[in-house]
């Protein structure tokens, strides 16, 4: 294992995180916030450790696949620990709570321990939003965009951090691909912030909401989330950008370069769009029939909640935990389904669901026709058996971790619905669940063990399980 290079990369990542603490520090200084010292101390500690680690000399600049997984896992753990310092030093919460809030931010989950985000200092509010934006595209991708020559095995870093079963490179060089992804990411963020400002949101609200929408994070500076604004225009703007952020960024790049036909050929996009429209239609119909809602309100709220949960953003325009049981069941299913591979969304991912369904269909055909050889394809390209197998393993691990999390959370003596949806929302990086962890509640009541458990599950979900699990394998740490 290339330990020196891994530690050096961790140091560079911590330096980037320290630089990201400057905007909330300045906001606090010029706004007269009480959290000035918190950010100053956190910046000095994070930056100091980062500089020391980044000075480590690495004779070998090559990262193998194993090194890539270990590096990504250690970087995210370090980011979570040092990113928690502003919360802790500000006196807003305990260190375990600070870890939970930071992990929830970086993994774009959006579950919070704060009962009233609106009462937090401006610096902390902005830090919450910024951590989600940092984690949405991936801070290692940002590092590759800024410092593409830091490691010769940068493709292994990108593979380990990027979501989805099949990785797509937009350019031959990993650094070029990272820069294209971040240009799209920044452009979407700026466009949404401008539209929200035009729609009537205060500038600070527009910026923080844009940061947490494009990252599909869901943190809001308002206690009532998006319901606070009571604006149909804001709701539809958010629906559009939540959907865009949950689509494979490769397809967005094709649209930017006017290759619309190529983008529309995506099987995953067609399935994902069908699920969003279908789930919204079913919920809207049920709301109209069972609750007597008018058609406009039913369609808007159904579309918003389906899009926010399937994209794993986690905003709310109303308490969907009070909706009919059929609606709640559909919302739980879309939380599990998640967005598209190669997006900022969490969940199982539409491409994996498509591959699992095709694998099931092929195996059923083999029962009837044992000699038939039928390869699985996606977008007209043959999918290797190794990829199909990895999707099945991922799905099993996903379910197992979710059930284990439910079991551990039940030790807090909360009901099954709350424990199950809390575990689901953690591994899918959604945010709100049902019952005691519903959209109008927070996670502050959980015990320290449960908060650390959820933090681990959130990291497993964001890194798609394997990078963290490989840390538990003794063979990873043996020198070869």
Task: Please tell me what each predicted stretch does.
Residues 1-480:
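Membrane-proximal intracellular helices of multi-pass ion channels
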């Amino acid at each position: 294992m290339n330990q020196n290079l891994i530690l050096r990369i961790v140091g560079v990542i911590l330096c980037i995180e320290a630089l990201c603490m400057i905007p909330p520090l300045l906001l606090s200084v010029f706004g007269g916030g009480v959290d000035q010292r918190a950010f100053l101390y956190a910046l000095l500690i994070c930056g100091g450790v980062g500089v020391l680690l980044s000075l480590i000399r690495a004779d070998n600049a090559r990262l193998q696949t194993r090194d890539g997984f270990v590096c990504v896992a250690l970087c995210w753990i370090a980011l979570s620990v040092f990113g928690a310092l502003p919360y802790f030093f500000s006196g807003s919460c305990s260190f375990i709570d600070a870890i939970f809030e930071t992990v929830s931010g970086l993994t774009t989950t959006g579950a919070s321990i704060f009962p009233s985000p609106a009462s937090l200092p401006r610096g902390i509010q902005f830090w919450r939003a910024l951590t989600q934006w940092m984690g949405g595209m991936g801070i290692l991708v940002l590092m590759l965009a800024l410092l593409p020559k830091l490691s010769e095995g940068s493709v292994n870093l990108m593979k380990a951090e990027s979501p989805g079963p099949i990785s797509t490179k937009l350019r031959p060089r990993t650094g070029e691909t990272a820069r294209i992804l971040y240009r799209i990411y920044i452009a979407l963020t700026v466009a949404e912030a401008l539209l929200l400002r035009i729609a009537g949101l205060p500038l600070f609200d527009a910026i923080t909401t844009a940061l947490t929408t494009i990252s599909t994070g869901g943190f809001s500076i308002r206690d009532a989330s998006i319901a606070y604004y009571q604006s149909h225009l804001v709701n539809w703007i958010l629906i559009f950008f939540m959907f865009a952020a949950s689509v494979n960024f490769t397809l967005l790049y094709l649209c930017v370069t006017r290759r619309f036909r190529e983008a529309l050929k995506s099987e995953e996009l067609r399935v994902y769009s069908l699920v969003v429209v279908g789930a919204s239609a079913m919920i809207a119909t049920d709301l109209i029939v069972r609750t007597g809602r008018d058609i406009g309100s039913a369609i808007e709220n159904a579309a918003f909640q389906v899009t926010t949960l399937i994209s794993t953003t986690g905003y709310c325009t109303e308490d969907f935990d009070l909706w009919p049981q059929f609606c709640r069941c559909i919302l739980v299913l879309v939380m599990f389904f998640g967005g598209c591979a190669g997006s900022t969304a969490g969940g199982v991912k539409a491409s994996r669901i498509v591959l699992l369904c095709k694998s099931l269909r092929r195996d059923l055909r083999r029962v009837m026709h044992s000699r038939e050889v039928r390869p699985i394809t996606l977008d007209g390209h043959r999918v290797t058996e190794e990829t199909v197998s990895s999707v099945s393993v991922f799905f099993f691990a996903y379910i197992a971790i979710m059930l284990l999390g439910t079991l551990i959370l039940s030790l807090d003596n909360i009901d099954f619905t709350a424990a199950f949806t809390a575990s689901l929302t953690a591994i899918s990086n959604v945010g709100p669940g049902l019952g005691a962890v519903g959209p109008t509640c927070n996670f502050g009541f959980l015990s320290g063990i449960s908060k650390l458990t959820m933090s681990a599950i959130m990291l497993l979900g964001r890194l798609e399980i394997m990078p963290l699990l490989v840390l538990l394998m003794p063979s990873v740490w043996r020198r070869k």
